[in-house]
């Protein structure tokens, strides 16, 4: 789409997702067996024919670079690019100090591409969004800035920017991560929150970034600094995400923040529901990613019993023998020996599980090897002595770990 530049913020450290982010940036964390978190933001752009995209990285970005090189290479197509951009300290010897600073340090890309509008989106949420519809709203309102927003229970809104709007969709109030979020008038218990997705008129964006960069007391963040300064000037509008329609889908919009181990696990369980609120199978809104050349998954009975796969996703290259898999997601090359019982668990790929293992509500990172007869998630008090266990009782096995040997 001419006149539009996409910039995706993909530098998140993801400290609340540890140990999954010990060796990778948050947007590179695998999801849904076949994908990485970054894929959902990229698909929202590509499916909307927005094909000039810079992906701004910072922490532990090598696996993200490799994934994008293999799965998102559009080089050779005139005026189309999806380019990862490492932090380069272009404006001084410092890393990005906030979301606005990340864009400011790369303002030269905006100047050189000369877009009319700049779409700045995050990369660590699970959702589908036709950005064209938000862009149409932005243009209709002739806004300097449009912020996408959704409704959520006020009790859960303190981790987000909370918005107030008038009857025309104009922003009249904004508070970043308030301790006591304001509810929508007439909707007790419900708050309107920012999704962290912005469309700027390019000239206004550059003006605000340059002004903010000169302020010593600024945290150089869109939510903390840029939006609170801009909305009183009267040209900031709010796009209601619930009005966004995806071709080929009839369900209500789905959006999930996967910033914690619990929410990451819950989002996977959403995929496995009988009427899943988030579908991976809409041919009219395909979810592109890098898919390695692997043989189909293989299921075989064994002397210990028949293989049972119930309400689960199993990726290519996997081999499961005489075991029971229920409500679980198994990534590429999952190797499950016989007589195992795995439920409500997530295996991120290239995982080996020995004979007779029991896994309950476990996340196993790539390359882990679990010894025969190991039980994880059955006795949480014992698990806490050996593994990372979240407050909600989700056990996480780190990347490459050898367990039970």
From Swiss-Prot:
<keyword id="KW-0808">Transferase</keyword>
<comment type="pathway">
    <text>Glycan biosynthesis; glycogen biosynthesis.</text>
</comment>
<keyword id="KW-0321">Glycogen metabolism</keyword>
<keyword id="KW-0548">Nucleotidyltransferase</keyword>
<keyword id="KW-0119">Carbohydrate metabolism</keyword>
<dbReference type="InterPro" id="IPR011831">
    <property type="entry name" value="ADP-Glc_PPase"/>
</dbReference>
<comment type="function">
    <text>Involved in the biosynthesis of ADP-glucose, a building block required for the elongation reactions to produce glycogen. Catalyzes the reaction between ATP and alpha-D-glucose 1-phosphate (G1P) to produce pyrophosphate and ADP-Glc.</text>
</comment>
<feature type="binding site">
    <location>
        <position position="194"/>
    </location>
    <ligand>
        <name>alpha-D-glucose 1-phosphate</name>
    </ligand>
</feature>
<dbReference type="Pfam" id="PF00483">
    <property type="entry name" value="NTP_transferase"/>
</dbReference>
<dbReference type="GO" id="GO:0005978">
    <property type="term" value="P:glycogen biosynthetic process"/>
</dbReference>
<keyword id="KW-0547">Nucleotide-binding</keyword>
<dbReference type="GO" id="GO:0005524">
    <property type="term" value="F:ATP binding"/>
</dbReference>
<dbReference type="InterPro" id="IPR056818">
    <property type="entry name" value="GlmU/GlgC-like_hexapep"/>
</dbReference>
<protein>
    <recommendedName>
        <fullName>Glucose-1-phosphate adenylyltransferase</fullName>
        <ecNumber>2.7.7.27</ecNumber>
    </recommendedName>
</protein>
<feature type="binding site">
    <location>
        <position position="161"/>
    </location>
    <ligand>
        <name>alpha-D-glucose 1-phosphate</name>
    </ligand>
</feature>
<keyword id="KW-0320">Glycogen biosynthesis</keyword>
<dbReference type="InterPro" id="IPR005836">
    <property type="entry name" value="ADP_Glu_pyroP_CS"/>
</dbReference>
<comment type="similarity">
    <text>Belongs to the bacterial/plant glucose-1-phosphate adenylyltransferase family.</text>
</comment>
<dbReference type="InterPro" id="IPR005835">
    <property type="entry name" value="NTP_transferase_dom"/>
</dbReference>
<dbReference type="GO" id="GO:0008878">
    <property type="term" value="F:glucose-1-phosphate adenylyltransferase activity"/>
</dbReference>
<keyword id="KW-0067">ATP-binding</keyword>
<feature type="binding site">
    <location>
        <position position="96"/>
    </location>
    <ligand>
        <name>alpha-D-glucose 1-phosphate</name>
    </ligand>
</feature>
<dbReference type="InterPro" id="IPR011004">
    <property type="entry name" value="Trimer_LpxA-like_sf"/>
</dbReference>
<dbReference type="InterPro" id="IPR023049">
    <property type="entry name" value="GlgC_bac"/>
</dbReference>
<dbReference type="InterPro" id="IPR029044">
    <property type="entry name" value="Nucleotide-diphossugar_trans"/>
</dbReference>
<feature type="binding site">
    <location>
        <begin position="176"/>
        <end position="177"/>
    </location>
    <ligand>
        <name>alpha-D-glucose 1-phosphate</name>
    </ligand>
</feature>
<dbReference type="Pfam" id="PF24894">
    <property type="entry name" value="Hexapep_GlmU"/>
</dbReference>
<comment type="subunit">
    <text>Homotetramer.</text>
</comment>
């Amino acid at each position: 789409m001419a006149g539009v530049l996409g910039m995706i913020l993909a530098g998140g450290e993801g400290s609340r997702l540890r140990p999954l982010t010990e060796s990778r940036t948050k947007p590179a964390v695998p999801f849904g067996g076949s994908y990485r978190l970054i894929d959902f933001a990229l698909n929202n752009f590509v499916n909307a024919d927005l094909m000039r995209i810079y992906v701004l990285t910072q922490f532990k970005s090598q696996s993200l670079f490799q994934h994008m090189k293999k799965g998102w290479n559009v080089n050779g197509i005139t005026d189309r690019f999806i380019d990862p951009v490492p932090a380069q300290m272009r404006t001084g010897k410092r890393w990005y100090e906030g979301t606005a600073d990340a864009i400011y340090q790369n303002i030269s890309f905006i100047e050189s591409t000369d877009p009319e509008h700049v779409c700045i989106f995050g990369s660590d949420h699970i959702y589908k969004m036709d950005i064209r519809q938000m862009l149409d709203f932005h243009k209709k309102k002739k806004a300097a800035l449009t912020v996408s927003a959704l409704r959520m229970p006020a009790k859960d809104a303190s981790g987000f920017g909370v918005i107030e709007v008038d009857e025309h969709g104009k922003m009249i109030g904004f508070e970043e991560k308030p301790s006591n979020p304001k509810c929508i008038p007439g909707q007790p218990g419900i708050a309107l929150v920012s999704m962290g997705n912005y469309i700027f008129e390019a000239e206004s964006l550059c003006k605000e970034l340059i002004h903010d960069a000169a302020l010593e007391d600024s945290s150089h963040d869109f939510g903390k600094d840029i939006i609170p300064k801009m909305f009183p000037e009267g040209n900031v509008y709010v796009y209601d995400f619930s009005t966004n329609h995806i071709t080929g889908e009839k369900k209500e919009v789905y959006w999930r923040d996967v910033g914690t181990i619990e929410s990451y696990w819950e989002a996977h369980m959403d995929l496995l529901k009988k009427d899943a609120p988030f579908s991976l199978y809409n041919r009219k809104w395909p979810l592109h990613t890098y898919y390695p050349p692997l043989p189909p998954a293989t299921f075989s009975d064994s002397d210990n019993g028949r293989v049972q796969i119930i309400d689960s996703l199993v990726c290519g290259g996997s081999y499961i023998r005489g075991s029971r898999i229920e409500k679980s997601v198994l990534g590429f090359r999952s190797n499950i020996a016989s007589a195992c019982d795995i439920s409500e668990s997530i295996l991120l790929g290239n995982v080996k599980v020995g004979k007779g293992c029991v896994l309950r509500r476990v996340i196993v990172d790539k390359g882990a090897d679990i010894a025969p007869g190991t039980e994880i998630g059955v006795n949480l008090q014992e698990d806490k002595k050996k593994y990372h266990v979240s407050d909600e009782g989700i056990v996480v096995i780190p990347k490459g770990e050898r367990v039970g040997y």
